[in-house]
Amino acid sequence: MPIKGPKARIKLSGLNPRELDRICSQIKEIANKTGVELSGPVPLPTRRMVVPVRKAPDGEGSETWDHWEMRVHKRLIDISADERALRQIMRIQVPRDVNIEIVLES
């Protein structure tokens, strides 16, 4: 359901999907308490980065490789731009590995 009027688009990204879901539930709780419209959280595609590295440090011997992987999970939430709700959202304790981007749109 699209939100009418000014809205805030909140983009969450991080390495741990449980932490993202926990923060999303806190944002949903704040939206329910303040009575503002909420759309989401929408899970965006997970970005998977793989780095292949040779095991042998000198280049000699058989070619054996290690594959290191990092997955970046993303969520998107639209909320109507209410000053009281946004102040409470900005006071949420966020872990270090979770990034939050808030963009106000009209």
Swiss-Prot record:
Q: What InterPro entries does the record tag this protein with? A: Ribosomal_uS10, Ribosomal_uS10_CS, Ribosomal_uS10_dom, Ribosomal_uS10_dom_sf, Ribosomal_uS10_euk/arc
Q: Which UniProt keywords apply?
A: Ribonucleoprotein, Ribosomal protein
Q: Which domain of life is it from?
A: Archaea
Q: Name one GO biological process term.
A: translation
GO cellular component annotations of the record? small ribosomal subunit
| MF-aspect GO terms | structural constituent of ribosome; tRNA binding
The yes or no answer to whether the keyword Transcription regulation is present is: no
Matches recorded under SUPFAM superfamilies: Ribosomal protein S10
**Annotated transmembrane regions:** none
List, alphabetically, the Pfam families matched: Ribosomal_S10 (PF00338)
**What does the record give as the function of this protein?**
Involved in the binding of tRNA to the ribosomes.
Q: HAMAP family, alphabetically?
A: Ribosomal_uS10
The UniProt family comment states: Belongs to the universal ribosomal protein uS10 family.
The record's subunit annotation is: Part of the 30S ribosomal subunit.
Annotated protein name in UniProt: Small ribosomal subunit protein uS10
Which species is the source of this protein?
Archaeoglobus fulgidus (strain ATCC 49558 / DSM 4304 / JCM 9628 / NBRC 100126 / VC-16)
